[in-house]
């Protein structure tokens, strides 16, 4: 099973607050530089890495001289605003020493729930990866309340895995992995090497909340692994304090706990599209486009003869032949109004007709399910 991690091409690495801030003592430049070194080595092997980093609130608390995490929402948000500045600066310096550029992306759950914003975020992240940039993602704690109060970056890491169709989510924490019981209370607890992410017994094994510095505990990591598995991504929970955990995992070494998914990211995505989409309209296609869809290719504007219904970018639409038979369904890259302006036209005309081009196809093949 460890070959699943060894063969992964796109990975999400989530680093917890306790690691980033050395248990609340302040940002730990040496630790950040070490992760940057490992990620640079993985990039050199052809891996694509997205970093999800906690630590803004904890770093802000240290800068403001606060010992205890406050309960008032406005004070948490103030700490996040102060800490995010130092967090991004420290990461930028660390990665630049290893020849890598970084990009800051602050997300909320609303960004990933709204289809248009979801597609925009996905396009940006995929482009950054293609450019060789390391995206550094954090929750936008300054403007979001529910995420600070109830949320955690373990969940965000799983959502980002879905967003970019990652193969693997690696959660680095201050524990070696998942144990059969809380090792701080039960000396007989043993480390679980691997298992199915959807196995419900792991929730019972996970302990309570984390430290006063971090928000989540092991239970949030298990639930994040379950969420990632539904996107087809495997999850490894490992200690960020061990030597070279990322490189050792990439070499197939049995580090931490591997919770594996039952399907690939693309299979999971296709299943989700088939089961959950509510159609907002239809695209009527000609015979050539119908053959292309049957062959598993993307739908281009030139093959569309009619647009039915009113919908926004990111909506689910049916692809039908000229007799009305549904051939496929998927997520459309342009609104109904935009589709009407570019139908029957080659992709090269999109920018001239609209003044911009979001994507070269109306529906990408990865966002299509053949009926």
UniProtKB/Swiss-Prot annotation:
Q: What GO cellular-component annotations does this UniProt entry give? A: cytosol
> Enzyme group, top EC level?
transferase
SMART domains with a match to the protein in the record: PUA
Residue numbers binding substrate: 54, 141, 153
Among CDD domains, the record links this protein to: AAK_G5K_ProB (cd04242), PUA_G5K (cd21157)
| UniProt pathway annotation | Amino-acid biosynthesis; L-proline biosynthesis; L-glutamate 5-semialdehyde from L-glutamate: step 1/2
Q: Which family does it belong to?
A: Belongs to the glutamate 5-kinase family.
Entries under InterPro entries matching the protein: AceGlu_kinase-like_sf, Asp/Glu/Uridylate_kinase, G5K_ProB, Glu/AcGlu_kinase, Glu_5kinase, Glu_5kinase/COase_Synthase, Glutamate_5-kinase_CS, PUA
What is the E.C. number? Answer: 2.7.2.11
All residue ranges annotated as the PUA domain in the record: 280-357
> What reactions does this protein catalyze?
L-glutamate + ATP = L-glutamyl 5-phosphate + ADP
The protein's matches in PANTHER family, at most eight in alphabetical order, are given as: GLUTAMATE 5-KINASE, ISOPENTENYL PHOSPHATE KINASE
Identification of the protein by name? Glutamate 5-kinase
Q: Which GO terms describe its molecular function?
A: ATP binding; glutamate 5-kinase activity; RNA binding
> What GO biological process terms does the UniProt entry carry, in alphabetical order?
L-proline biosynthetic process
Lineage: superkingdom: Bacteria
HAMAP family assigned to the protein according to its UniProt record, in alphabetical order: ProB (MF_00456)
Keyword terms: Amino-acid biosynthesis, ATP-binding, Cytoplasm, Kinase, Nucleotide-binding, Proline biosynthesis, Transferase
| Entry binding sites for ATP | 14, 173-174
Location in the cell: Cytoplasm
Reported function: Catalyzes the transfer of a phosphate group to glutamate to form L-glutamate 5-phosphate.
């Amino acid at each position: 099973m460890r070959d699943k991690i060894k063969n992964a091409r796109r990975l999400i690495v989530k680093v917890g607050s306790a690691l980033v801030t050395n248990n609340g003592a302040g940002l730990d430049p040496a630790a950040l530089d070490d992760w940057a070194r490992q990620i640079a080595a993985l990039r050199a092997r052809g891996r694509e890495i997205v970093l999800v980093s906690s630590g803004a609130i904890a770093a802000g608390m240290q800068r403001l001289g606060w010992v205890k995490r406050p309960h008032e929402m406005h004070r948490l948000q103030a700490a996040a605003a102060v800490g995010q500045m130092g967090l991004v600066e420290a990461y930028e310096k660390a990665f630049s020493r290893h020849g890598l550029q970084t990009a800051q992306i602050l997300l909320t759950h609303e960004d990933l729930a709204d289809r248009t914003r979801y597609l925009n975020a996905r396009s940006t992240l995929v482009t950054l990866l293609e450019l060789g940039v390391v995206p550094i993602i954090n929750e936008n704690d300054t403007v979001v309340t529910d995420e600070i109060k109830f949320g955690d970056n373990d969940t965000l890491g799983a959502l980002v895995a879905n967003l970019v169709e990652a193969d693997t989510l690696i959660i680095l924490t201050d524990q070696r992995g998942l144990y059969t019981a809380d090792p701080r209370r039960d000396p007989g607890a043993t480390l679980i090497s691997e298992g199915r992410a959807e196995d419900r017994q792991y929730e019972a094994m996970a302990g309570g909340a984390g430290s006063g510095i971090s928000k989540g505990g092991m239970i949030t990591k298990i639930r994040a692994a379950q969420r990632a598995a539904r996107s087809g991504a495997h999850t490894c929970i490992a200690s960020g304090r061990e030597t070279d955990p990322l490189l050792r995992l990439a070499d197939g070494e049995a580090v931490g706990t591997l919770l594996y998914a039952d399907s690939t990211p693309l299979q999971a995505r296709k299943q989700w599209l088939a089961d959950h989409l509510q159609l907002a309209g239809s695209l009527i296609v000609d015979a050539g486009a119908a053959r292309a869809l049957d062959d598993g290719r993307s739908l281009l504007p030139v093959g569309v003869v009619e647009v039915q219904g009113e919908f926004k970018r990111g909506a689910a639409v049916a692809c039908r032949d000229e007799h009305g038979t549904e051939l496929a369904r998927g997520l459309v890259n342009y609104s109904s109004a935009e589709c009407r302006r570019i139908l029957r036209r080659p992709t090269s005309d999109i920018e001239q007709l609209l003044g911009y081009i979001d994507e070269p196809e109306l529906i990408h093949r990865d966002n299509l399910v053949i009926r």
